[in-house]
Amino acid sequence: MTFKALHARDRTEHLGYGVFVHVLTSSVDARLAAFFEAYDAAFILDDEKEDLAGFKACLDLNDGAAYARLSALYGPYREVVLMLTRGEDGPVLGAANFIAFAGDGASLTVSLSYIFVDSGQRNRGHFSRLIQLVRNEAKASFAWPGDTPEPLVFIEMNDPVNMSPEDYALDSAHAGLDQVDRLKIWERRGARIVDMPYRQPPLSAQQTADSDLLLGVMGAPGESLDACLMAQHMRRFFGVTVLKGADPDSAPVAAEQLARLDAACTRRERIGLTGFERIFEQAARVPRDRTAPA
């Protein structure tokens, strides 16, 4: 069997109790407008946000000549939007956007770009449901040559130590959730912090790089990750999702990080994974407005 991505998985499913999941992989899907409206209301910091054109540009890379070119470089991949609604055509409860990379068929890595639950729908299991849907959909997006691997799911998290006081207060108030409390949500779900400097390259020509982020991972079986696997995944993520198909070596922020990872790969090093204790201790020493409304 030829190893490939499966391109016909867009659908709507009833999950029970009136909750529906919508799976989107096309920029012309009419449901994308509802997703973007909810997404745009959930995120407020300019340099972390995609505009609608950015999402469409990413989804356009799932097919045609662009997919043929990029999959030849990076292997099979799928960019996916998942959206939960109350009723098939009802209000958005939450959503996630991710890209899954299958590499050579032996591993599965995922970058979870965005995940959110509507502020009025929290504590109802929607976040956990979305996380599981991301894992399941990533695995089901490819015709695997052998056993289906469990995914490594990479996440970007706001760094409560490096964020400016203004961004910290604005984002916490907008979300109704303190930055440290957000990290605790990821910690409870088994996430680890990838022990390496991380900067997200600019998402568009109008934006700047985001250095106020921590890179985390869920699903890692040990205390470290192979540097070669990290280099491959980050090159794919930067090249497809962040830079919309452009060469990551042509973007200085991406190229600098990839050069470090490539060198670590050459030396056969491993990238350590840590818990959240150190960042919590550091955050406790930084004066912040931690009065985000409930």
Q: Where are the regions that the model predicts?
A:
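Terminal substrate-recognition subdomain of acyl/acetyltransferases
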Residues: 1-42, 143-294
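Conserved acetyl-CoA-binding loop-helix of GNAT-fold acetyltransferases
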Residues: 117, 122-140, 149
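Glycine-centered flexibility sites
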Residues: 94, 123-127, 190
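Short, well-structured alpha-helical interface segments that form or flank functional binding sites
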Residues: 107-110, 125-129, 133, 177-181
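Short, charged/polar micro-motifs that form catalytic or ligand-binding hotspots
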Residues: 25, 45, 117-124, 128, ...
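A conserved beta-strand-loop-helix scaffold within acyl/acetyltransferase catalytic domains
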Residues: 36-119, 141, 204
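Short His-Asn-centered micro-motif
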Residues: 113-115, 134, 155-158
